[in-house]
């Protein structure tokens, strides 16, 4: 762990562990979300997949690339524990092979390494989060390794925060500015 002084405050720096990036999937069949953590995955590999355009400006010797947008995806390899909600949800999709709108699931990506705690009484801690309309792209069910591999295509994402009570996140729309969170009115 490294210690440094910034603006009169002492801060510590350390590695951010895998438990600080937490995906949740909405397992509800209604409009009220029921967030369940994707717990038994052995992979959390987010690819940002920048979509670029190349411009061959007359003032430049060589063509130049610019990022037009991103097409992020989160790869998962879910170990098959039959009593886990994440397995039940994904296996239901494996069994039914949904397409179109039926392959979409709302996902929360919580970045627990980045938070803001209010000075209110009682204090409220907000964690950075994305709420995402995700397409679940099923890959491989491997019965030998007891896993289901799938990708979450992270389509429309909204930045905001979550609060957590008893391990259950609640989505809070709002904005982050210089490390502080302001909930929408």
Model-predicted segments: where are they?
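Extracellular/virion structural assembly segments
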Residues: 61-129, 159-166
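Disordered, low-complexity tails and leader-like regions
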Residues: 5-6, 156
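Short secondary-structure transition/capping segments
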Residues: 14-18, 153-169
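Short beta-strand and beta-hairpin "edge-sheet" elements
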Residues: 44-46, 110-160
């Amino acid at each position: 762990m490294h210690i440094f002084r910034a603006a009169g405050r002492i801060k510590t720096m350390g590695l951010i562990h895998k438990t600080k990036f937490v995906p949740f999937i909405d397992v509800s069949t209604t409009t009220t979300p029921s967030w369940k953590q994707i717990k038994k995955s052995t992979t959390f590999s987010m690819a940002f997949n920048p979509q670029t355009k190349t411009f061959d400006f007359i003032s430049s010797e060589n063509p130049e690339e610019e990022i037009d947008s991103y097409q992020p995806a989160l790869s998962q390899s879910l170990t098959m524990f039959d009593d886990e909600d994440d397995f039940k949800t994904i296996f239901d999709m494996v069994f039914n092979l949904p397409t179109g709108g039926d392959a979409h699931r709302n996902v929360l990506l919580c970045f627990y390494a980045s938070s803001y705690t209010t000075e209110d009484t009682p204090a409220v801690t907000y964690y950075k989060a994305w709420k995402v309309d995700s397409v679940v792209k099923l890959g491989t069910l491997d019965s030998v390794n007891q896993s289901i591999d799938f990708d979450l295509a992270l389509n429309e994402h909204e930045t905001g925060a979550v609060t957590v009570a008893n391990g259950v996140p609640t989505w809070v729309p709002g904005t982050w500015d210089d490390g502080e969170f302001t909930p929408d009115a």
